[in-house]
């Protein structure tokens, strides 16, 4: 879980972070 968040921040930056997390939890 936290590794996904860490990778999302690294690869996409904070602006895309919220969208990625939203999609992740709604799969």
From Swiss-Prot:
The keyword Mitochondrion applies. Keywords: Mitochondrion. It is found in: Mitochondrion. GO terms for cellular component: mitochondrion. This is Uncharacterized 3.5 kDa protein in COX1 5'region.
């Amino acid at each position: 879980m936290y590794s996904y968040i860490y990778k999302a921040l690294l690869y996409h930056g904070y602006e895309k972070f919220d969208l990625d997390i939203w999609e992740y939890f709604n799969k």
